[in-house]
Amino acid sequence: MKILDALLFPVIFIMFFIHLSIAQTDPELTIMTRLGQVQGTRLPVPDRSHVIAFLGIPFAEPPLGKMRFKPPEPKKPWNDVFDARDYPSACYQYVDTSYPGFSGTEMWNPNRMMSEDCLYLNVWVPATPRPHNLTVMVWIYGGGFYSGSSSLDVYDGRYLAHSEKVVVVSMNYRVSAFGFLALNGSAEAPGNVGLLDQRLALQWVQDNIHFFGGNPKQVTIFGESAGAASVGMHLLSPDSRPKFTRAILQSGVPNGPWRTVSFDEARRRAIKLGRLVGCPDGNDTDLIDCLRSKQPQDLIDQEWLVLPFSGLFRFSFVPVIDGVVFPDTPEAMLNSGNFKDTQILLGVNQNEGSYFLIYGAPGFSKDNESLITREDFLQGVKMSVPHANEIGLEAVILQYTDWMDEDNPIKNREAMDDIVGDHNVVCPLQHFAKMYAQYSILQGQTGTASQGNLGWGNSGSASNSGNSQVSVYLYMFDHRASNLVWPEWMGVIHGYEIEFVFGLPLEKRLNYTLEEEKLSRRMMKYWANFARTGNPNINVDGSIDSRRRWPVFTSTEQKHVGLNTDSLKVHKGLKSQFCALWNRFLPRLLNVTENIDDAERQWKAEFHRWSSYMMHWKNQFDHYSKQERCTNL
């Protein structure tokens, strides 16, 4: 037996070596990029076919040591074949332990070990003969700028790449303090380096995606939540605009209450973090040196304590208005038309607020029906709009209360869902869509540039050309997945359209229904059609299904579609009445009442309460008046 083993060993070794050599020389699996060779792997898809995946390709030097908090540096070339057959480490981030073992939260936690050496990207290529000039779709994950990873199962690009014959790319970027800690004037911690990670990955796509059969002139960036806000920020940032073609924004935009902070607030949070981890007060250089000396988990453990108030849908380290990445605030840039002139597709889910309510709103839990008392509702409103004064809070309460049934615990629960979702997602996104669409009309009418007050030359802003390329497509996703593990009252939750965009219902073992598989195929087609042509209705062969046409959103008609298992339906006005409160009335109200002295503010608040009481009294009196009276006394 030993002699036989001795004879067989060289044969086995040679066969293994031949197999390895074939794998390394297979033109499908080994690609030469500008930086060096990468070796990928074949991944199966449900129809007995496969895609080619290149997982964990480095696009930046590891941001370790002195590079912590600094902008990324492009990856240097390598000599050997880089093994790109498995996902990279996740960037350091907060891990949600609120519901241990519960798949609804665990699916968003990193599924790879965490490391600061995390700036890698993934590429999925359809297994077509010699792919060439394919449309490219680059995914940017969400997670409140404090979490997220490109390796999550829900972001698996194989199904979208295979079904729509597009090249799918996703990247890791730094989050939390590692990506967004900012000290004004400091080159060591300028802020926004997480966005610069994304931009460097987009530059890698421009430089290398043609080696994988992709077209660098046909790149659509898409993302969800903070990932969608990031997409919108690249639409605004002048240096990002040339690096992609179109944009899809799912449940997030760059304007709104949680996406950015001022440099003063960013500095306050950086200093507070230093104190929390034991850094002595001193100058910026000393602070950064001390923060760099700390273990990554030390910073993660303290990050939530830097917030100036307790609120829902608020995050510690987010992009900062720096005058470089952002020449001005997102609101100001939108209002002046200073954004990329291109087509956008964007939308929201039906219940954008429910997910965030279980993380601190009084009375809410995933483990019960969350029937909310009036007292819990009023406390929840304060947490939902932490920047508002008493008058502003009364305005929100007045708008969202059913005064004929104000103590109804189900209606209070639904109102809280609407308040959080409308304030943070729906209404900022509606405003973003309207501003984009409005500038398309203005440029068509004037046919002239207004770049004198913008100064961006040929940077691709919507207001520098009379021939605007802008068109807007808006959706409301309102299908609750049949296998969703969250309670029924949470509805169509923030983030749960992603699995349909990435084609997970095509995987039989995941137990979606046939109707959900069809919905997923439709959504992938809409997304890919838009990426190819700027119009979700135009199929890859140029045909259009006239029976189910998705109309352009305009600032006047405001048409949008409902995405669900039914046939496509067109609606008008995305929560227009409620968004008038958030986008127009409340900002003006807070501005007018900002300088009112305490006595007058208290009087006005009491007056609003009295008005509400009188309205309630009148309703009760009217009800009493309509009752039959006893006539026998």
From Swiss-Prot:
Membrane topology: Peripheral membrane protein
Signal peptide interval: 1-23
One BP annotation, GO: choline metabolic process
Active site: S225, E352, H494
Reaction catalysis annotation: acetylcholine + H2O = choline + acetate + H(+)
GO cellular component, one term: extracellular space
Localisation per UniProt entry: Synapse; Secreted; Cell membrane
Positions annotated as glycosylated: N133, N184, N283, N368, N511, N591
Pfam family, one: COesterase
EC number from the UniProt entry: 3.1.1.7
Similarity comment: family membership: Belongs to the type-B carboxylesterase/lipase family.
Protein name listed in UniProt: Acetylcholinesterase
Classification of source organism: Eukaryota, Metazoa, Chordata, Craniata, Vertebrata
